[in-house]
């Protein structure tokens, strides 16, 4: 279904089995009290006497934060008929029962949704400075606390967005040319006050700590105690501790793989901005249980001949001057870790081109590694995208790993407990840094992705074709024939690796939008139905029921959630009780 065709109205991170799809929207005005120089919180929860009720598709009440925060509303269950595709009609009802709040982290001043909550009063939360934008958010799956990574700050908030703790990460005097960084040894370069952009925010549940990585000092990380954001350790004395000095958010992604009773592993992918000698583009690192361990963030394996990392060769950067790999999303499923990336194409006939970024063609790819593979022999990378009516969507914007629910699973030929990957792509393969508004919501099954990777491995081990990883190998390398059985858990050998491919892994296109580029996606399951929530370039939220092939998806409605039209960012998360939603945006 297309965004242009829908007459159902125009239209958030975690797939959850919701108790009900929320439909009734309660709005409330209430007083607030100043508890901090930058934080306003409500004195009381809304009662029932002052709650006018409006019907809406919006499945979650909303609360926002990003330079500021707004608190809002809650919704009652929708009827089964509404889940079958009927449009929900707005009308005023009598006040409903006492309700809580739903939240969205949004980047605007005292945000008001004109169509739903005109005249309402909202609480607000904002950083010390307007330019210190929010970058990442995550919700603790046991306590429900929110952790927000921002420019120069890490915040811990309660579920209703009350500020609990703030940890300073910048600004500090620095210079990107200082290597090793200033905190290790003096630097002769001129130093200037430099902001610290949060690029990675991960909860290490097994050790009750938060990993926060920024752009300062060549990309140093901190391990913070979850309770009070106290610094447990800030590793910085080895070159392995510098992840990347790129100060752009959305270019790095990490996945923590815990190990019961043992040290965990951090898989991390990052853009390197031409500093391939300093930073690997992808690596796996140690996460010792002891924060003071000298092995903290060391590579899992590092010898002269084999290592748990891959670097972009200098020859590639010499031939394709703007080459880099941007890591959009990552996750673990089964025995594997996956990353979704966007990178310039480097076919054989273009490796001698050093054109501008506007001349480059970009490819979105899925990268798979075995969780226990310290040698990276299991590295496989295949292109991914969607096609609708002959139009290719190849520029990845966002992704989310979720569950399909009974209805979508049946249409995809999988179990309701299988993993599915929701993705948003923009049209074409050019202008990655300024993607087209024409975009598509698609779904892949992890089972299909693994099957395509298995086929690629089997073909190569039969001696067919080449490794097809020109950006890394610099040339076409013939696959080596070897009588090796390739099963579903195959993790590679010291031949035929690392392995690429050129055959597109195509997802199922669910929904397209030609004018308001989709920028984020999440999902939840109710009564067997899968519902996707999609943020857009203009600060809107879409609700889409996902039926899968051949019907695609049905958009119910769209609501404007950001007054100044700032894009909704990738990070979205449900609250612990699954009745709340947090959506983030920054002032562009």
Where in this protein do the model-derived segments appear?
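Intrinsically disordered, low-complexity basic segments at termini and long loops, enriched
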Residues: 1-83
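Residue-level signal for tight coil/turn positions that link beta-strands
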Residues: 55, 141-143, 151, 205-207, ...
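N-terminal signal peptide
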Residues: 57, 72, 84-86, 96-128
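Beta-strand-rich domains and repeat architectures in extracellular enzymes and scaffolds
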Residues: 122-153, 195-200, 248-253, 324-329, ...
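Double-stranded DNA-binding cores of transcription factors and transposases
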Residues: 137, 157-169
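Beta-propeller fold recognition
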Residues: 164-188, 199, 203-208, 214-322, ...
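Surface-exposed extracellular loop regions of Gram-negative outer-membrane beta-barrel proteins
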Residues: 322-340
């Amino acid at each position: 279904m297309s965004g242009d065709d829908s007459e159902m109205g125009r239209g958030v991170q975690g797939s959850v089995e919701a108790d009900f799809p929320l439909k009734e929207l309660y709005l409330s005005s209430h007083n607030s009290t100043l508890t901090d120089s930058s934080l306003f919180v409500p004195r009381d929860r809304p009662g029932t006497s002052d709650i006018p009720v409006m019907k809406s598709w919006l499945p979650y009440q909303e609360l926002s934060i990003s330079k500021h925060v707004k608190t809002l509303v809650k919704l009652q269950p929708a009827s089964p008929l509404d889940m079958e595709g009927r449009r929900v009609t707005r009308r005023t009802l009598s006040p409903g029962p006492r309700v809580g709040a739903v939240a969205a982290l949004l980047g605007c001043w005292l945000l008001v949704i004109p169509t739903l909550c005109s005249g309402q009063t909202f609480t607000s939360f904002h950083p010390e400075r307007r330019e210190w934008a929010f970058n990442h958010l995550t919700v603790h799956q046991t306590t429900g606390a929110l952790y927000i990574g921002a420019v120069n700050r890490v915040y811990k908030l309660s579920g209703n967005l009350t500020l609990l703790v703030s940890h300073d990460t910048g600004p500090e005097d620095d210079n990107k040319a200082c290597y090793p960084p200033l905190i290790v040894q003096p630097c002769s370069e001129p130093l200037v006050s430099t902001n610290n952009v949060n690029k990675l925010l991960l909860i290490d549940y097994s050790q009750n700590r938060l990993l926060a990585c920024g752009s300062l000092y060549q990309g140093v990380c901190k391990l913070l105690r979850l309770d009070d954001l106290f610094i447990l350790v800030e590793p910085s004395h080895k070159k392995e501790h510098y992840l990347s000095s790129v100060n752009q958010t959305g270019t790095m992604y990490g996945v923590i793989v815990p190990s019961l009773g043992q040290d965990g592993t951090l898989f991390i992918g990052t853009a390197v901005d031409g500093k391939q000698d300093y930073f690997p583009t992808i690596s796996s690192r140690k996460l010792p249980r002891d924060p003071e361990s000298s092995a903290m963030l060391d590579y899992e394996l590092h010898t002269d001949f084999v290592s748990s990392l891959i670097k972009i060769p200098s020859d590639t950067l010499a031939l394709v001057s703007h080459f880099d790999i941007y890591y959009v999303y990552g996750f673990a499923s089964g025995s594997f870790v996956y990353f979704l990336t966007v990178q310039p194409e480097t076919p054989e006939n273009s490796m001698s081109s050093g054109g501008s970024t506007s001349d480059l063609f970009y490819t979105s790819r899925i990268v798979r590694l075995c969780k226990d593979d310290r040698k990276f022999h299991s590295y496989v990378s295949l292109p991914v995208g969607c096609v609708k009516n002959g139009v290719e969507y190849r520029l990845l914007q966002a992704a989310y790993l979720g569950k399909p629910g009974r209805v979508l699973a049946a249409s995809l030929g999988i179990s309701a407990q299988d993993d599915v990957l929701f993705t948003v792509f923009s049209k074409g393969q050019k202008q990655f840094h300024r993607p087209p508004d024409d975009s598509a919501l698609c779904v892949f099954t992890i089972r299909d992705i693994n099957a395509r990777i298995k086929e690629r491995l089997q073909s190569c081990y039969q001696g067919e074709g080449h490794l097809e990883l020109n950006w890394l190998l610099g040339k076409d390398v013939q696959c080596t024939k070897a009588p090796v059985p390739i099963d579903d858990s195959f993790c590679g050998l010291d031949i035929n690796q690392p392995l690429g491919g050129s055959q597109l892994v195509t997802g199922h296109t669910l929904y397209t939008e030609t004018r308001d580029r989709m920028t984020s996606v999440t999902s939840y399951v109710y009564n067997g139905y899968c519902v996707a929530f999609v943020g857009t370039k203009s600060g809107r939220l879409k609700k889409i029921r996902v039926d899968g092939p051949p019907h695609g998806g049905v958009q119910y409605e769209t609501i404007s959630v950001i007054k100044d039209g700032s894009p909704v960012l990738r990070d979205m998360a449900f609250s612990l009780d699954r009745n709340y939603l947090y959506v983030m945006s920054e002032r562009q």
